[in-house]
Each structure stands twice: as structure tokens, then as C-alpha cells.
Amino acid sequence: MSSISNVYHDYSSFSNATTFSQVYQNFNQLDNLNVFEKLWGSYYYYMANDLFATGLLFFLTHEIFYFGRCLPWAIIDRIPYFRKWKIQDEKIPSDKEQWECLKSVLTSHFLVEAFPIWFFHPLCQKIGISYQVPFPKITDMLIQWAVFFVLEDTWHYWFHRGLHYGVFYKYIHKQHHRYAAPFGLAAEYAHPVEVALLGLGTVGIPIVWCLITGNLHLFTVSIWIILRLFQAVDAHSGYEFPWSLHNFLPFWAGADHHDEHHHYFIGGYSSSFRWWDFILDTEAGPKAKKGREDKVKQNVEKLQKKNL
């Protein structure tokens, strides 16, 4: 029996269950749990093997939500009506490009990313990441997701910027820049070393958080990974809509920020936010270049006036 049953002191009212539906009916008797907690508890109880349950959960979560988020963008690429919002409207990914990208991403998922997933549950037990029910308070999870976004963005900025130097770009990061006009599926089209390095920011930051605070739930990590997947896919979508998030949150990076990075190959190294590129003057594109040139010109003029 799965150790999730240890959360409760009395299972005398539970009937013998052989199907997931029957297990859920048992958990449905517990009034102190919401529907998501009941589903979560039922899943672990039914699987009866926490290591396998966590590994399968994370693998399926990654596959379902990554490709599920890519699919709408692939459909939009085939509908001419949306071209007016396509940032590089003359560069629509062909079926061949989509297929080649899909094969590479699937290979990476099964041969690079799938293997370490099965070690995550023992790590959870080792450092104290909870997977029991009930879940933490929503306010706690919101704070943690916000912190993870900020810290991951910092990790991504510096390591992504580092991958644009010399041999790191030539032998590792160049693969990701095969598509000068990105599309959703290309979000995880990358060299295995890059997948591991940048992925470490997504997974490693929650681990460090738990080591420091001792307060983290596996459900929080699961939702964080989904949010990060959505952010990455949307940033590579190649579309800028009037309702895009950065039009309401100016510091959010969004597709236009990352599209310019792919178009011009340098600058725009952040993942979720714009502040690192703004502070360190590494924004991409002609507008940013002109801004830097104007700034240099102004500084020269000030210096000349000072020396008169």
C-alpha cells in the first residue's frame, strides 16, 4: 500500500478497491479534502508504488502539457488569418521543419529528460519535499511560484548568455538557433547539454528552496513545471497579440522579446522577465541598438561640453 495512506488514521470506512474509480470514491468520503487533493491522494493510493507514481506523474505531465501547449500554435501557423500577428510573418515553419523538430524533441524527452525523472521521488524523500495530502495553502504556493520565476529567470539569463560565447555557442547552443523564426515546438529543441544546464534552473531552484526552508510540496513543483513549460512554448510561438501578457505586465518578456533574440542571435537572454536585459543593456533588435547608440552619442556630447 502506498505510504500516502499514512496521512490518515482511520481507513475502516474504505471499501476494497480494485479500480481508480473505486479508490476515488473512497477518498471522496474525506470531507477535509478538495477535489484536486482527492484525485492526488487517489492516484498515489491506487498506484501503490510512490517511486513509480511520481516518475510517471512527472513524465506524463511534461509530455501532455508541453505538446498540449504546442498544438494550438501549430494550428495557428496553418491559419492565414493569424499572420497579421506573426512577428516574422514571412517565415512560417514548414511541415518538414515541424516534423524534424518533433523527432529531435521526442528523442531528447525519452533519452535525456526521462532518465533523471525516476530519481526525483527518492530525492523528495531525502530532502523533505512532501507529496501527501492536503496541499499547502494557496498563498504559500503563489509565493513559491513567484520566487521560482524570478530565480529561474536569473539562472537562465546568465547561463544562456554564457552559451553565446565561443565554443559554447558553436558546439552546444547553435542547435537551438537553427530556427531564426521560432515556433512553439522549438522551445525544447536543444543540445542535451543545454537541456540539462537550463533545465537545472527549473528543477534545481525548488530543490534549493526546500533545502533552505524545509517547506515545499510536490504538487507545487508540478504546477511550477507546467507554468514554466507554458512560458517557454509561448515565448517561442512567434506571435505578438494585443492581449499578450507583456502588454499588461511590461516587465514580462513574452514572444516579441525572445523572437528578436532568435532573429538577431544576440541579446535578449532572459526567459520570463525583461529586467536583466534592461539593466545590463543586452536587449536585442534594432530598436535596442539605436537606443544604445543614442546613449553613447549623448554621453559623448556631454563629455565634449564638459571639456569646453
From Swiss-Prot:
Chemical reaction(s) catalysed: 4,4-dimethyl-5alpha-cholest-7-en-3beta-ol + 6 Fe(II)-[cytochrome b5] + 3 O2 + 5 H(+) = 4alpha-carboxy-4beta-methyl-5alpha-cholest-7-ene-3beta-ol + 6 Fe(III)-[cytochrome b5] + 4 H2O
Motif (Histidine box-3): 257-263
Biological role: Catalyzes the three-step monooxygenation required for the demethylation of 4,4-dimethyl and 4alpha-methylsterols. The third module or late pathway involves the ergosterol synthesis itself through consecutive reactions that mainly occur in the endoplasmic reticulum (ER) membrane.
Segments traversing the membrane: 56-76
Motif position, Histidine box-1: 160-164
Gene Ontology cellular component list: endoplasmic reticulum; endoplasmic reticulum membrane
Known cofactor(s): Fe cation
One GO term of the biological process aspect: ergosterol biosynthetic process
Motif (Histidine box-2): 173-177
Superkingdom to which the source organism belongs: Eukaryota
EC number: 1.14.18.9
Class of this enzyme: oxidoreductase
Pathway, per record: Steroid biosynthesis; zymosterol biosynthesis; zymosterol from lanosterol: step 3/6
Keyword NAD listed: yes
Protein name: C-4 methylsterol oxidase
Keywords, alphabetical: Endoplasmic reticulum, Iron, Lipid biosynthesis, Lipid metabolism, Membrane, NAD, Oxidoreductase, Steroid biosynthesis, Steroid metabolism, Sterol biosynthesis, Sterol metabolism, Transmembrane, Transmembrane helix
Ranges where the Fatty acid hydroxylase domain occurs: 145-282
Entry remark concerning the domains of this protein: The histidine box domains may contain the active site and/or be involved in metal ion binding.
Alphabetized Pfam families for the sequence: FA_hydroxylase
Membrane topology reported for the UniProt record: Single-pass membrane protein
Induction: Expression is induced by fluconazole and in azole-resistant strains. Expression is induced during biofilm formation. Expression is up-regulated when ERG6, CYP51/ERG11 or ERG24 are deleted.
KO phenotype (gene knockout): Essential gene; conditional lethal mutations decrease the production of ergosterol and accumulate 4,4-dimethylzymosterol.
Entry GO MF terms: C-4 methylsterol oxidase activity; iron ion binding
InterPro entries: Fatty_acid_hydroxylase, Sterol_Desaturase_Related
